[in-house]
């Protein structure tokens, strides 16, 4: 039946597909003429509304899916679940299980008409771009630097697990049923299930660690390295198996395989050769082309849009080529993604341009559209259900064991081994895509696909909350020994971790390190860590410039830091030892890099720049970086040693401790003294601050004044008897120390108002203040002031000194003594 419109431009026709009438519109017009329906035919029942067109329909589905998964995630994240679980549940809600056949909602989300082409193409492009972006984020250098532990765990968790499952499968095949019928699983389905169950994909593991904020932890780095090894080994194995299967089918078709048929018939050997040629082109042509684009991009300028568009066209072509070569559609884009240099400027430009749209909109659409074939009602009475559950549980247990055993062999704690096994057993978008591809090609039946999707949903819902409970990243930063300045042996080496966030932090940090008075008798070993935000790659990078473990182009990230601290080392040759590092990671996990480096090098002090910077005269606020503030607070919470937060103010009227001299032994007769005041209220943080001030007093050009606040309040004294005894003992040693010249005074204070007045009267007399943080410690000197504090990380006294009301132009160093110990 054909119905022509008045303009003769299109018609509607009825076609039959398996007994179902499908109305099609020719020629296909993907976009409508507007929201309001227009009368085109005499019969109003055949009018075409705007939602009957492909693109408006697709946009409405995007909107519904985005709303649903974000609504679900709003509640599920409070249970410790990640976004992928919300994506899967959205797909389940829109599947056959909940949308009944022939209902209006089912017809709206159905693709059984001309819109199927648009929907399928959109889902395929989403999956293709996801793998390309994961390739861009992935650091291929991680493979070269992977240790034996990660290689052993990666190979064992995948290859050995698959081998053992194969033995179990063939050995117990008769017990679980092997007849090829509509009611039981066939052998191909078993192979597909346990093969996918034994995999560990880098994108899946990386996304899980990112959402749990574990990628910077020791466990996270090990899991990422193991997943990379697993990915590459399984990719090579899968390519070989696909090639062998194609070759076997070709041999069956021809009776033999020879060169003539290969060349003339476009068969498996030719496809394999094209795949190898494509990899070589990606390495030796595409990657140099990417470096050419980087070279053509001026420093600080964005990458030209034409370059990015050309890359995306090449990615689409690689997906088509991979599909033609009988490989997975993501193989080509993933290889091209690996060939793109990660990080700025090109890698980060690609990520910034496409990541939000792909991960926020298109990827949920792919997951939801892949899950629409889930039909829970088909499982009732299905005889193969027990068999598929058995093989899934068996595969999980085998993989869990073969991940745990190698980890135990390398001496990892039992809890960490279990956590690592759960991470490697996590299932995500890769497994969903693999099952969807198998279902599309007829390798698994609808019931098997339904169970597999439900298992992935259950797996993603259970494992993340267990990991949050089982593994605490802060626990690994706790030490067995006291790592602070107060308990260091006299004249022993002081190890300091100096953090650099901005180039403006370099000079103040060097100035502070000089004030600590390094000498040959009591040297200072400083570990300089330049922290940069991770953009354009998935796995964090940690560069040791001393070992030169990274490529030369990556060391340019920290060139200013390297040059400045190398000069500092030469100026204090024999008294200062410098090791410089660069860490590229997400802001939420940067504290892991800081704490791990401090733990590995047994430092006694971590120096952190304050998140605010001021003008040259110290009066005007220039920048206020909340990301740095959150990072500092995270370090204060989990640091394995003492921590100092340095609030630097450079005033033209103030003196610079390093001005006029190049070495610690050199003296300048006309050099003005540098006045430092230590405000002592009592407690372990203040005792740590006194220890640092005493060390600074060894420099004859630094005048140290210790002002102790005392009170006659008996109640306050009774509540801190033990602390007061330790305070008195330390201060007695300081006053009796004849090697340093320290001015000591005591001020009687009755309440917080007098404390504030005293500090206000002192701010113009000193160049720097040193105070203890005193976190959680109540004192009559500060009672009532805490509720007015703006920066809790500075403590009450430190916050007062940095507040605008005080008009203090002196620098402030806030000290917190080591808190975490096992």
Curated annotation (Swiss-Prot):
Keyword Translocase listed: no
GO molecular function, one term: antiporter activity
Similarity comment: Belongs to the monovalent cation:proton antiporter 2 (CPA2) transporter (TC 2.A.37) family. CHX (TC 2.A.37.4) subfamily.
Name of the protein this chain belongs to: Cation/H(+) antiporter 3
Keyword Ion transport attached: yes
Keywords, sorted A to Z: Antiport, Ion transport, Membrane, Potassium, Potassium transport, Transmembrane, Transmembrane helix, Transport
Gene3D superfamilies xrefs: 1.20.1530.20
Bilayer-crossing regions: 55-75, 116-136, 150-170, 190-210, 224-244, 274-294, 305-325, 331-351, 362-382, 388-408, 418-438, 447-467
InterPro entries assigned to the protein according to its UniProt record, in alphabetical order: Cation/H_exchanger_TM, CPA2_transporter, Na+/solute_symporter_sf
GO biological process, one term: potassium ion transport
Membrane topology (UniProt): Multi-pass membrane protein
Role, per record: May operate as a cation/H(+) antiporter.
One GO CC term, this protein: membrane
Pfam families (UniProt xref): CHX17_2nd, CHX17_C, Na_H_Exchanger
Subcellular location: Membrane
